[in-house]
Structures are given as structure tokens and as C-alpha cells.
Amino acid sequence: MPLSYPHFRKLLLLDDEAGLLEEELPRLADEGLNRRVAEDLNLQLPNVSIPWTHKVGNFTGLYSSTVPTFNPDWLTPSFPDIHLHQDLIHKCEQFVGPLTKNELRRLKLVMPSRFFPKVTKYFPMEKGIKPYYPDNVVNHYFKTRHYLHTLWKAGILYKRESTRSASFCGSPYSWEQELQHGSTSINDTKGHGTESLCTQSSGILSRPSAGSSIQGKFQQSRLGLQQKQGQLANGKQGRSGRIRSWVHTPTRWPAGVEPTGTGCAYNIASRSASCFHQSAVREKTNPSLSTSKRHSSTGHAVELNPVPPGSVRSEGKGSVLSCWWLQFRDTEPCSDYCLSHIINLLEDWGPCYEHGQHHIRTPRTPARVTGGVFLVDKNPHNTTESRLVVDFSQFSRGNTRVSWPKFAVPNLQSLTNLLSSNLSWLSLDVSAAFYHLPLHPAAMPHLLVGSSGLSRYVARLSSTSRIHDHQHGTMQNLHNSCSRNLYVSLLLLFKTFGRKLHLYSHPIILGFRKIPMGVGLSPFLLAQFTSAICSVVRRAFPHCLAFSYMDDLVLGAKSVQHLESLYTAVTNFLLSVGIHLNTSKTKRWGYTLNFMGYVIGSWGSLPQDHIVQKIKACFRKLPVNRPIDWKVCQRIVGLLGFAAPFTQCGYPALMPLYACITAKQAFVFSPTYKAFLCQQYMHLYPVARQRPGLCQVFADATPTGWGLAIGHQRMRGTFVAPLPIHTAELLAACFARSRSGAKLIGTDNSVVLSRKYTSFPWLLGCAANWILRGTSFVYVPSALNPADDPSRGRLGLYRPLLRLPFQPTTGRTSLYAASPSVPSHLPDRVHFASPLHVAWRPP
């Protein structure tokens, strides 16, 4: 007869009328009983022939592809002019006096941040914007391009100008070596890599070797480049020999040089800061490749003028035309949906390229990307704004993956010890926290995003634009990209972006200037940064509490008035060092703080209500007697694991689910097991704050017997059959708790001390978790343990009771910025379980 739920509760000793604990509890360690119960509750893992269920409520499992939804009305969020002050450390010292070693170390980590991957794979520019929304490709392309442009304007990205230079907006840092006024000229006196012959973005000409005197050759005539090309091309002139082969047989496209959708024209548009408009472009100039000396924001740079659309210079098979977008202007419309209708809407489409206020030298940066980007909703509650997702997962994959530094996540008990108090709380919102931390320019070549330009994007979409060899350079080929879809999309986008459509249709390569979210290093750096800032604030206001996890900052003070004045002082300090706060999102919590998914008050902590509601919904939808795919189980365990510390049996209750996930098997919920879990999660108990105290109760065990020392009283007992030592020690601790009621117990067993009961026989783990809930353990060495003798059957010998004080720990989220080293390996299950899984360390 299957095991009923009331019978099962009784078996687990969860009812009050259970028999004598010393007799009942050891039975739960019996393997046979555990096996029979598992069979009854269907917990062993059957190889099920019934098809697996792949969806439970909102949880999807294997073989499910969630189709993302594109929102054509997405707004691009605005980024304030974020600039973390370079003299951050100096400002902190003015605020609080000399910084501690830990604070200094953490702040130096991010000023500037560095990123050195072992290997970087470069992808073609076409992979820059991911085709994430097949039905809205053009729309997504422009919205993403606009987002990238916004980030560049906000000083968060560098724009690759040439192989060795980049431009950016905003305030420069001292480690960003600016191209000095005039250092882009040909007469390069410095022997080390300042950019010469700067054709700014296209990077067509590389710098010559030191001391080469090409300057005169360029000033002889407007056609100097044409005449001296032979001399330029000889190998003695450093690497500039590349120009000749480039002009004649273009094989690779530098960042600014794009083939049209048809591959017939190369864009050698000038990228000077004073980019000329179409009026200038359409002037008649010499059809040959002419050079002019123009004054750009970096000084006198020699640049290549764009060749006007009218003039075609045959060079091999191809023809050098200016810009794909503007070529449509001088052509006959091919249909009602020809792009030339849109291009003729405006006389002046603005510059082909924009340049930043500052130009810097960078390491060699290829015209490639290292990660793709796409847009999604900002968060489940805000679908009006978009968020840029950057996929730099290449750095976390394969055998060249970067092992990201681990950092301490505050565990639940530490958080409760620290924040469960009668303080009044408020939380601060740091806007775009990741984009505060500057990256060294040396990291730029590893973190490249961008796009290949609309023409190539469209060429990939349009099935008709198969480029045949004999078609090279024909106008028909240009119009291959015209289609009704593209026409309608561009017409709608024209309302939003106006003449920026032209700018966005050009290719671009951008590198990160601030830390991107898609790299495992970023969360670590952000956590280090905010914890150091909080440490500084705590030392400046010792009577208050400041605490942070990632970009979540909370402030606590004794009274509301006190909190308000603290808020003003801290806000002013943060603004003075360049940290941007979103003051409209400041939340005042009163005496119960909502933080990291918990509600924390003076009584302890509980999960927030929205999590409790999710759990209830999950149980409502949970099917019984149907095999559920392990991926769904993983998601269910992720949700239940978060609230497990607040239940009677804790994590051990979820062990059958963990086992099925590890074995990648389906799991069948029996009615009894579901009822058991449901009851567990319907009644949540707060996790209370630990109190300091003196340990008066000690437990010890041998495989055959147990012993307790409760004050001056000694007790002992034997087990019916020998047990594994850890199991025996756990039983002894349970007896000590039930006999004495003490919340502080001394033990010499590290497993009991860690309070992880998941490796014990299942039934025992569940029962012990409930008996020992809220108990704190103190480590006592075996030689000094007063319960050692009774456990060996010697009651006559009295060792004196130790004075063992217990001090609750706040873990590695310590109040002062002291941070012990992180253990090298945590069990795999930690990832989706809960912060509670960080073990207690013996004091």
C-alpha cells in the first residue's frame, strides 16, 4: 500500500506525537527504510517510456525555443554623461582619511580595469548584429545601430578610426594617449607608433617606419599620392607598402571601406571631423584618387577625399564610387519601391561618418568583431525601453576560456546577521552601474562590436542579389537590394531617425571603453568597486550602515531624520566622485528592507512576496504521476531552492530532484511527495539573526555510541548498529538540541558544523534539518570536547567545560573591507541553489 502523506509526516518526526527521539531518529538513517520510502514515493529514477513533459506553468524545459518578441516602438535608454573621476582615491581620502589596504586594492582594480583573454577569435563584420528577429531585420538593424551610436556618444564605446587609432566622446583619462596635435602628420619624429598618414577610419595607409620622410612627396602636388605611388610601394618605407596592392586588388575591407550590396564599389569616403556634406561631394573633382590636407580635430591629417558618385574610375573590374546610400540619387527608379525615392527625400543627408572629440592610439585593431549584439526588453516590468545584449561568450568557452575571478555572494545567514536590525532603510539606484568603470584601451581589440553596413546586411537578406562575375559594377546590381519590405521599413524608420539613416547605413567598428555586461569579469569588478565605496561610507559614518551587492546600495540609520541627512551626505559624496544616481528610483523602506529578493526586518528574513506567489503558482501547475523533463526540474529547483532555508526540511527535501537533474533523467512527482513539498512551502519560517553567546552544550559520537555534555550533566547512549561517523555525529547533535533546547551547540564534526545535511540518508537529512533549525554550532577540538568521554562510554571522567564564546559572522560580506580569500572550489549545485550554500568556516 503506497505511503500516505500523514504517515510520511509521522515517519519524518514532523508531528508532535512522535516517540522517543533517541529511538526513532537512528531508524531514519537505515538504508533499507530509505530505499522502501523512495520506491513508495516513486523517487528512484525510472527510465520512463512515457513521453516527458517539457513545460510546467512558466517553466520551459528541453527542446523549447522561446521566440523573442520584437517591439518596433522600443525606446533607446539615455545614458547620462557618466565619467568616474580619475582622482577617485584622492577624493575618498579627503572624505574619510587614509584608505585601508583592501579599499585601495579594490579601487585600483577598476582605475582602469584590465582584460587579458588568452585567445580572441575575430568574426566577420556581418556577424556584428545578430539576426535575432527574422521578421524585423531592418528595423532591428537600425534600432541596434542607434543604440550603439548612443553608447558611443555617451563615451561608453571607442570608434575604430584606423588599425591603430580610435576616437571617443566625453572626458579623456590619463591612460588614453591622445594623438598629439600634428602627430598624425607624416613627419613623425617619435620612433614609436603614433599614427601617420591618418586616413582616419578606413585605415587604408599604415604608418611608415620611424624617420621616413614622405612628407615632401605629398606636398608636391594635389596628385602627389598618384605620382609617388611607386616610391610609396617599395618595401623600404616600412609597412606603408600596402597601399599599392590595396588600391589595385582590394581583398579585405577595412572598417570604413564597404562594398555595396552588389560588391561593385568601394567606399573611400573621407572621415575627417569636418566630414563634407553632399553639396561638397557632388563637386567635380579630379577622378583620380586625390589627397588634400584638411584640418581635423586631431591636427593636420592627410586624408583621402571621397570620389563623387558621378565619377567612375575603372580599376580592374570594380569601380570606386562613394557611398552606397547616395549612389541611388543619380539612378533611375527601378520600381515603385526603389530606394532612390527615399534617398531623394532629402538634399543633404549629412556626413557619412562622425568622429569623436578625442583621438587616441590603440593596439592593432582589425576590422572585425569579437561578439554579436541584439536588443531585448529592458526587463520583464519595462518593455518600452530596450537593452543591448552583447554576446562575448567566446571568452567563457572551450579550453582557452578565461576563468573569471570568484567573489563572495553574501549568504542568507550573513545577510540576516548584518541587516536584521531595527534600523530605518533606503536603497539607492546607480544608473548604468557597469558603464561607470573605465577599461584600459589595451582591452579594446578584444571587445569589438559593430556592423557591416546596411548594404551587406540587405545583400544577405535579398535572394535576388546573387553576385555574378559578369554583373560587377552594373547599376542593375545596385537595385537588386530594392524590395517592398526594405522600402516600407526605411520609410517608417525615416520618421524616427531622419537623415541619421544615412550615417547608420555605413559600416562601423566599436570597442568598449567601459566594462561591458557580457563578460564574466564585469560583475566581479562591479562588486569590488561598490563594496569598496560602501566600506568608505561606513567608515565615514560609523553609526550608520551602508551595504552593497553589485549595483544595489542600501543605507540604514537609527531614525528617519538621521537617514535623510545621511542620504544627502552620501549622495553628494557619490556625485562628487562621478557616480550617477537615479534619484527618482530611491526607495525608502521604513524598518523592513527589501534586498536581494528577501524581506529583512528585526525578526529575521523571509522571501519577498512575489517569490512566494511564484512558488504557489508553480505548485498549482505541477502535474502528478507524469514524467517531467530534468530541465524543467532544474528551473523548479532554482525557484524552490531560493526559499528552501525558510522551510522545515530545507534543501534535503529537494534532494530527489537534485539527483534526477544530475542523472539527466525525468522526474515523476508522486501525490505524497508533491503534498509534502507543497506543505513545506506553504508555511515559511523566518531565518533569524544569530546571537552571540557562550556554548554550554556539547555533543560527540563514535560509530557505536553518542555522548552529550549539558552544563555539568553528562549523558551517553549506544546505537543498535554501527553507523558512519558523520551520521552518528549528526544524531548526537540532534539529541543535544532536543534534550537541552540550546541554540548553541559545540561539535568537533565539520560536516555538522557546515549545516549542510544533503549528503546524509534522505529521511535523516530532512528530519535533522527541522530539529536543528536555528541552531548555531561552535567548533570544539576533539581533545577538548567534554562530550568525548561519554561518547566512548566513560561517564566517570569529567573534563572541565570550556568557555567557548560564539560570535555570529557576517561572512565575507564583512562590515569593514577585509575580505578573506575565496575558497577555490564550491560544489556545482551552488549555482542555482542559494546564497546559503557558503559554508561556515571554523573560527
From Swiss-Prot:
Renumbered to this chain, region (Polymerase/reverse transcriptase domain (RT)) spans 347-690
Annotated site residues (Priming of reverse-transcription by covalently linking the first nucleotide of the (-)DNA) in this chain: 63
- Give me the ranges of the annotated region Disordered: 180-221, 282-313
Q: Which InterPro entries would you find in this protein's record?
A: DNA/RNA_pol_sf, DNApol_viral_C, DNApol_viral_N, HBV_DPOL, Rev_trsase/Diguanyl_cyclase, RT_dom, Viral_Replic_Matur_Polypro
Indicate yes or no for the key word Metal-binding.
Answer: yes
Q: Where is the Reverse transcriptase domain?
A: 357-600
Q: Which GO terms describe its molecular function?
A: DNA binding; DNA-directed DNA polymerase activity; metal ion binding; RNA-directed DNA polymerase activity; RNA-DNA hybrid ribonuclease activity
Q: How activity is regulated?
A: Activated by host HSP70 and HSP40 in vitro to be able to bind the epsilon loop of the pgRNA. Because deletion of the RNase H region renders the protein partly chaperone-independent, the chaperones may be needed indirectly to relieve occlusion of the RNA-binding site by this domain. Inhibited by several reverse-transcriptase inhibitors: Lamivudine, Adefovir and Entecavir.
Q: Which reaction does it catalyse?
A: DNA(n) + a 2'-deoxyribonucleoside 5'-triphosphate = DNA(n+1) + diphosphate; Endonucleolytic cleavage to 5'-phosphomonoester
Kindly state which keywords UniProt assigns to this record, in alphabetical order.
DNA replication, DNA-binding, DNA-directed DNA polymerase, Endonuclease, Host-virus interaction, Hydrolase, Inhibition of host innate immune response by virus, Inhibition of host RLR pathway by virus, Magnesium, Metal-binding, Multifunctional enzyme, Nuclease, Nucleotidyltransferase, RNA-directed DNA polymerase, Transferase, Viral immunoevasion
Pfam families, sorted:
DNA_pol_viral_C, DNA_pol_viral_N, RVT_1
Instruction: Return the annotated region ranges for Terminal protein domain (TP).
Output: 1-177
**Which Gene3D superfamilies does UniProt cross-reference here?**
3.30.70.270
Q: Where does Mg(2+) bind?
A: 429, 551-552
Q: Bias category Polar residues: which stretches?
A: 196-221
Top-level taxon of origin: Viruses
Q: Please list the GO biological process terms of this entry.
A: DNA replication; symbiont-mediated suppression of host innate immune response
Per the entry's comment, what about the domains?
Answer: Terminal protein domain (TP) is hepadnavirus-specific. Spacer domain is highly variable and separates the TP and RT domains. Polymerase/reverse-transcriptase domain (RT) and ribonuclease H domain (RH) are similar to retrovirus reverse transcriptase/RNase H. The polymerase/reverse transcriptase (RT) and ribonuclease H (RH) domains are structured in five subdomains: finger, palm, thumb, connection and RNase H. Within the palm subdomain, the 'primer grip' region is thought to be involved in the positioning of the primer terminus for accommodating the incoming nucleotide. The RH domain stabilizes the association of RT with primer-template.
Function recorded in the entry: Multifunctional enzyme that converts the viral RNA genome into dsDNA in viral cytoplasmic capsids. This enzyme displays a DNA polymerase activity that can copy either DNA or RNA templates, and a ribonuclease H (RNase H) activity that cleaves the RNA strand of RNA-DNA heteroduplexes in a partially processive 3'- to 5'-endonucleasic mode. Neo-synthesized pregenomic RNA (pgRNA) are encapsidated together with the P protein, and reverse-transcribed inside the nucleocapsid.
The similarity annotation says: Belongs to the hepadnaviridae P protein family.
What other remark does the UniProt record contain for this protein?
A: Hepadnaviral virions contain probably just one P protein molecule per particle.
In Swiss-Prot or TrEMBL terms, this protein is called Protein P
> What species is given as this protein's source?
Hepatitis B virus genotype F1 subtype adw4 (isolate El Salvador/1116Sal/1997)
Encoding gene (name): P
